[in-house]
From Swiss-Prot:
Binds the lower part of the 30S subunit head. Binds mRNA in the 70S ribosome, positioning it for translation. It comes from the Bacteria. NCBIfam families: rpsC_bact (TIGR01009). HAMAP family: Ribosomal_uS3_B. Part of the 30S ribosomal subunit. Forms a tight complex with proteins S10 and S14. InterPro entries: KH_dom-like_a/b, KH_dom_type_2, KH_sf_prok-type, Ribosomal_S3_C_sf, Ribosomal_uS3_bac-typ, Ribosomal_uS3_C, Ribosomal_uS3_CS. GO terms for biological process: translation. The keyword Cell membrane does not apply. One of its GO terms (molecular function) is mRNA binding. The lineage of its organism: Bacteria, Pseudomonadati, Coprothermobacterota, Coprothermobacteria, Coprothermobacterales. Belongs to the universal ribosomal protein uS3 family. Residues 39-109 form the KH type-2 domain. It holds the Pfam family Ribosomal_S3_C. This is Small ribosomal subunit protein uS3.
Length: 234
């Protein structure tokens, strides 16, 4: 069987950026990772209906910046910023007042081509007993109309209440999963039904990143440029 790597992790540092950006002493790493996971769980629990694409967390000393990418920023900000202030207070309480927390909200301009938002939408429809085939086909159609070059959606579990779990998928366009320069977005969601849980996976190909050099860290570029000079001097 072919072994499949996570599409996001495969491209970290190439076409994708880390969603947790901080440096910590060795003994603090487990604590920071658990805190990040609790923050993401809190946000998705309260604002999952707002079309959350991703939650990025930055730390510097005792300061923390939480960046939320969402399709409906107004639902998180609230009237006169009331909701976002309540969320900030909950995060501060979760962290036991150890951090000065700031929250930044960014709008996802094209949610039809955001894999996490698409998979969440399909999962919610399955929970409302909408036909999974209909939900998948509609999502594929919207994504292709919105500029995606390829899309694959897979669902697995007791589909339609069947006794035996199975896996089904639909594919349209091209999906170069093994090419590092290809911009492939990936999302995963779980639909909770009375028959059990159904997993929803979504891959969306948005085209190639033309200039990879701009995405590489400066230090790596400097080392790459100096290497031929060392050989020449030798």
């Amino acid at each position: 069987m072919g072994q499949k790597i996570h599409p996001y992790g495969f491209r970290l540092g190439v076409t994708k950026n880390w969603r947790s950006r901080w440096v910590a002493p060795f003994e603090k790493y487990p604590e920071y990772i658990v805190q990040d996971e609790k923050i993401r769980t809190l946000i998705n629990k309260h604002y999952g209906h707002a079309g959350i694409s991703s939650v990025e967390i930055e730390r510097l000393g005792n300061k923390m910046r939480v960046i939320i990418w969402t399709a409906r920023p107004g639902m998180i900000i609230g009237k006169q910023g009331a909701e976002i202030e309540r969320l900030r207070e909950e995060i501060v309480k979760l962290l036991k007042n150890d951090y000065e927390v700031r929250i930044a909200i960014y709008e996802v301009k094209n949610p039809e081509t955001d894999a996490q938002i698409v998979s969440d939408s399909i999962a919610r429809q399955i929970e409302r007993r909408v036909s999974y085939k209909r939900a998948m086909k509609q999502a594929i159609s919207r994504a292709m109309r919105s500029g995606a070059q390829g899309i694959k959606i897979a669902v697995s579990g007791r589909l339609g209440g069947a006794e035996i779990a199975r896996r089904e998928w639909f594919v349209q366009g091209k999906l170069p999963l093994s090419t590092l320069k290809s911009d492939v977005d990936y999302g995963y969601s779980i639909a909770v039904t009375k028959y059990g849980t159904i997993g929803v996976k979504c891959w969306i190909y948005k085209g190639d990143v033309e200039d990879l050099q701009e995405l590489l860290p400066p230090r790596g570029l400097e080392r790459a440029e100096r290497r031929p000079e060392r050989h020449a001097n030798a």
